[in-house]
């Protein structure tokens, strides 16, 4: 329900401009330029989210576009130096979902120095809030907590097609050079 947007990291266009103006690819294959393009793409995503929400539309960010990166590249028939960064579904909401609880500020912000020392027990209150959130949802109800998700099987040695992301990015000619 709604429209699907897939936001693409696009350095192909820059390559074509350089080529038509008599230049080689220059630094287009570097990690630095890849990160700049990724950041530009994420800013575009955020701008579309802001615009959609200002019009009363609902949004669902979809990281699942990278669940099978090789298949996604094939389906989208993308040229070299491009890569699908994020999907976004935009549409008229059929319900008013409860907002997912956010980590407390003391775990997401800092001043001048990253706080390295904390105890998992400090997340107890947040875990309870997240557990209640999942338990009260209309769809995909479950008993779960933030710390259980972080400590769960997804971050163990679990192998899936998402493990091919770096290979897929490199196959597109992106982030090949770390200089």
Model-based region annotation:
Residues 1-179:
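Acidic, surface-exposed loops and disordered segments
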């Amino acid at each position: 329900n709604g429209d699907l947007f897939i936001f693409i990291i696009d350095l192909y266009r820059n390559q074509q401009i350089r080529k038509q103006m008599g230049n080689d690819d220059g630094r287009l294959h570097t990690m630095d330029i890849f990160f700049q393009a990724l950041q530009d793409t994420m800013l575009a995503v955020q701008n579309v989210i802001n615009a959609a929400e200002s019009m009363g539309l609902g949004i669902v960010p979809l990281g699942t576009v990278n669940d099978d990166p090789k298949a996604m590249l094939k389906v989208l028939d993308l040229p070299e130096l491009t890569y699908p960064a994020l999907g976004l579904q935009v549409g008229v909401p059929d319900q008013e979902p409860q907002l997912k609880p956010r980590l407390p500020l003391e775990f997401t912000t800092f001043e001048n120095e990253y706080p390295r020392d904390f105890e998992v027990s400090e997340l107890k209150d947040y875990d309870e809030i997240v557990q209640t959130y999942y338990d009260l949802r209309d769809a995909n109800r479950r008993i779960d907590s933030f710390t259980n998700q972080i400590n769960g099987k997804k971050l163990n040695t679990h192998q899936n097609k998402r493990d091919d992301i770096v290979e897929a990015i490199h196959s597109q000619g992106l982030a090949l050079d770390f200089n």
